[in-house]
Amino acid sequence: MFGGLEPEALRRILLVRLDNLGDTLLTTPAFQAIRQVLTEAHLALLASPSGCEIGRLDPDIDETIVYHAPSEDVYFRLPQDPGRELAAVERLKERDFDAAIIFTSYKQSALPAAYLCYLAGIPLRAAGSFEGPGSLLTHRHRYKERVPPPHETLRGLELTEFLGFPPVEPEMVLVPHAEDEEGASRILEQHGVERFILVHPGASASSRGYPPERYAFVVKELHRESGLPVLVTGGPGERDLTSRVAGSVGISLGGETSFGTFTSLVGRAMVVVTNNTGTTHVASALKRPVVTVFAGTNPPEQWGPWRTPNRLLVHSVPCAPCYKRVCPIGHECLTGIAPRTVIGAALDLLDSPVRTTAEAVRQA
């Protein structure tokens, strides 16, 4: 490990993933690769508030540390506050980490996080970096350029293999707690629901959101044609969205679930319908059939559903992948996907036989 170190020398490891919930979930196979070797080590996850939700449902993680990284503040919501950053350095310094492993996606720089760990006195600092890191990184990996790019689950494993950790199966890890399962059961009992379809219309960027009026039509027709209730989920800031999408036939749950309870609901859904957002990866981790309405923001080969029955809906446009958070030209990549196509994909997955996890992996 780390160029010849014995596992016993790596007692306290900081795992860093500073972007969103789905990105962190896609890195859990790499966390598992580390845990399988460092069975007794303390593994802490430094992540965004949403990323820490993944850490809390990953048995390989011992501690989560919330950090609002300025390098990920794409909407400029964080006030400039050097004191806040120095306090973050002190929090890490107090924990006396032996090593930090920094995970990033394509187009992200590992160097802001590397500098944070450098200031915190963490002696070993590893990441993949296209940029020259100087002494900010003690172990630098150069990711291989591939077209099309590999799935994001494999990117983290490429870094851990570079560091000497044996490969593991690229399966995401997400385990709801007992209280999450109980919360999901209460919601279903409250609404008299057993078998159901789950629709999650929100996304962290507007460029990845299928139009709400189209989702509303999808919900209405799925309920009519399948005879199943349709749960429409969303976060606290999405109550209006879920209510609008649910209409008079769906069950709006915007802001009514914790992430753990939401995860448990996804795990029980007959089929999940969503955008290219974290919910796609939650469904993949739990081996639930998923329809992903995929915007042209990112390569679908890299960010689409993984090892689960799925229908990946893509409308090709010349501007894809744009990597934009707001579409400046009319969302043709999404408006080009007809609601009937979404409905047909969901009904097709509903008609597929129920599969075990192993069977789902073989099909995918």
Residue spans for each PLM region:
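Catalytic machinery of carbohydrate-active enzymes
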Residues: 1-364
